[in-house]
Amino acid sequence: MTTTGTTAFNMEFTELAEEAWERAGREMRTGYDLRTARRSLNLMTIEWANRGINMWTIETGTITLTQGLATYALPTDTIDLLDHVIRTQANNAATQADLSITRISVSTYATIPNKMVQGRPIQVWIQRLSGETNPTTAVLDGAITATATTITLSSVVGLAGSGFIRLGTEDIYYGYISGSVLGGVFRGQNNTTAAAQTDGTAVFVPQLPAVTVWPTPDGSQQYQFVYYRMRRIQDAGAGIQTADMNFRFLPCVVAGLAYYIAMKVPELQGRLDMLKKVYDEQYALAAQEDREKATLRLVPRIAFIGGGS
């Protein structure tokens, strides 16, 4: 007998929900059963992000740095950066170089005496914000062109001393506030396009994940910030869509969803202990396999008192 010759098995969300409900102890009967399963799946994938690194969510990205601009937005679904370098002479096979850039804390960045000094960046502070957008009471006090480098607002109450604002579809970075004027402005950030804005345009504050490099890039050469990021797992969608995860996690997602569902249904809570045990076991199996398998070599650093290091 022959085998199928295929390795494409996956499960649509409706199938995941049906299997989870059956494991929890009863059939999925109503539209609400499907809706509550979708909500539980979204919460569970957030739990997975809190547990650690999910290899299938690692993506690479590149930001071309601008002279005089220290802070750059990351994609809004970024959870954290795993590694990063500064690239010089990009795309030149003979001279391209990826150079180390050290991650620092907010307290370390805060104690840098001159944050405006320019040079090749050697340190980076990562701001792990939510990606949500908040409204403000401020509006534009006067129209601006697409090239304006200062922006006057009706009020700056609630704005950070520096950061991002959103006008229409354009994200704008400002470096400082003087009175009601935003200065040190860089237009068209976060892959948006600089555009003219009319008087009275509402001001929003996007909580963009971002990196701040130091020294601030100079103009001696072109720098790129190359990073590997961990992104959020995509939302559970409609019934015909598959889950955003590696196939190795399908047994885990079904077991976990069954446990989450049973927590919400009183007549199923007698199965909670068993479902939790199965969920933990399946997660451990999947997480153990979903990892890098590379050689690790540790070398002791030997130093002598009075002899330097």
Locate the predicted segments by residue:
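Glycine-enriched, solvent-exposed interface loops adjoining structured elements
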Residues: 1-135, 166, 204-309
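Autoprocessing Asn-cyclization modules and mimics
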Residues: 55-67, 99-102, 129-204
